[in-house]
């Protein structure tokens, strides 16, 4: 969705152009879709759990118009630095999803726009971490010293310690293209 600072109004939920169609193509290939999100605005008192639920409900409604269904969404409401096991990049949300849905890390990918998403993928042992340049992605990639002038997608050489993504993708459609080309993704796309 389009990034809005501490999004709490369902009527402000707006998809990034092309995102729903890319998600639909992934679903058509048998991928299950999950959302894992840090929502420290709840702990900060900037939004409530009900606000978050209303936003997620609106997202589900919009996606349903494209025949896209999220299998589940998990969120961490805690502040950074509070030592919880669920806040990305910690793997707590992955562990919960893996246990409940029988996911396998080597058949799962994370697509995100923040370094914490990428580190979450590494800490969870996922097959790949894809940084999209939408939302915060452009600034995050530049903070890692990565060239963002490419078109489509760019596969990076392995990174010791998982400090950078496996793949940079211009947007979700480019990420979907890479996943489709892998032909190794089974039952679980995070």
What are these regions (language model features)?
Residues 49-71, 80-109, 114-190:
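Asp-based, Mg2+/Mn2+-dependent phosphohydrolase catalytic module
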Residues 6-9, 43-45, 78-80, 102-104:
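A short, structure-level motif marking secondary-structure boundaries and short turns
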């Amino acid at each position: 969705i389009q990034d809005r600072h501490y999004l709490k109004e369902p009527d402000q939920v707006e998809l990034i152009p092309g995102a729903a169609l890319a998600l639909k193509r992934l679903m058509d290939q048998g991928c299950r879709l999950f959302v894992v999100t840090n929502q420290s605005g709840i702990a900060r008192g900037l939004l409530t759990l009900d606000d978050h639920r209303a936003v997620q409900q609106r997202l589900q409604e919009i996606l349903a118009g494209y025949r896209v269904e999220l299998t589940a969404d998990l969120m961490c409401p805690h502040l950074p630095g509070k030592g919880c096991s669920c806040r990305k990049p910690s793997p707590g949300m992955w562990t919960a999803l893996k246990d409940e849905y029988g996911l396998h890390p080597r058949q799962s990918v994370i697509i995100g726009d923040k370094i914490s998403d990428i580190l979450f993928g590494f800490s969870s042992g996922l097959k790949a971490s894809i940084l999209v340049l939408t939302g915060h992605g452009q600034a995050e990639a530049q903070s890692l010293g990565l060239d963002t002038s490419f078109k489509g997608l760019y596969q990076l050489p392995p990174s010791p310690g998982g400090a950078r993504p496996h793949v940079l993708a211009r947007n979700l459609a480019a990420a979907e293209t890479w996943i489709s080309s892998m032909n190794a993704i089974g039952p679980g796309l995070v």
